[in-house]
Amino acid sequence: YNTEGILCPDCQGILKYEHNTYANLGAYICEGCGCKRPDLDYRLTELVELTNNRSRFVIDGQEYGIQIGGLYNIYNALAAVAIARFLGADSQLIKQGFDKSRAVFGRQETFHIGDKKCTLVLIKNPVGATQAIEMIKLAPYPFSLSVLLNANYADGIDTSWIWDADFEQITDMDIPEINAGGVRHSEIARRLRVTGYAAEKITETSSLEQVLKTIENQDCKHAYILATYTAMLEFRELLA
């Protein structure tokens, strides 16, 4: 898994990690040429709260909060803090900015299909997909899952990356049903069956309109939709 991510960018040797956050992120060093993670100017010093739709955390003594879930979005927030502080913004101004931030355009975008509360999450590579899966795993309620896989140029025509994403985690979640949809619905359905999730609970269709209708008629009151880029755009058009 992610073998490219553990190769030294200077000499292509194998990186060693003192600790690993996720994927290739963490405190690394190459024993061959000495390449290592640069010293940090800003760092997360405490994780106060992490849920599927929000988080609170401390960066160098200052607590911040964002209204979007997942560890990967805390990384995004850390980058925003570093840039804002570099440009001269104080912590209070940064907090105000975070307080106004909301999920947008397929990045944990929320909407209703009938009386079902739905969350749409873009996936496009194994690391991002795995982080999205870990984020939905934090949900404290049952939800249906739809995974929409297209293979247009904007998605990437090679869909083999789905085998490097950690879909196996779905077997630990309260998911009563799964919809496999999109142009490559058979491929993502096969990937989901391999996890050990009950095959009879996986519905497979190329029609995103049918996926929408299935969500509308499901018993579960919550739904997560993980979609590649063009599948996300097509699904959003159906909601207009």
Regions found by a protein language model. Give the residues of each.
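Glycine-rich phosphate-binding loop signature in dinucleotide/nucleotide-binding domains
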Residues: 87, 138-142, 215-222
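Residue-level signal for inorganic ion chemistry
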Residues: 76, 80, 178, 225
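Glycine/charged-rich beta-loop-alpha catalytic/anionic-binding loops adjacent to active sites
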Residues: 58-66, 111-116
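Gly/charged, well-structured mid-domain segments that form the phosphate/adenylate-handling core
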Residues: 35, 50-52, 83-123
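Extended acidic/charged loop-beta regions that coordinate divalent cations
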Residues: 1-63
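Active-site beta-alpha connecting loops in nucleotide-dependent enzymes
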Residues: 1-6, 104, 122-204
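A conserved, hydrophobic alpha-helical segment in the catalytic core
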Residues: 25-39, 68-99
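A glycine-rich beta-strand to alpha-helix segment
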Residues: 208-240
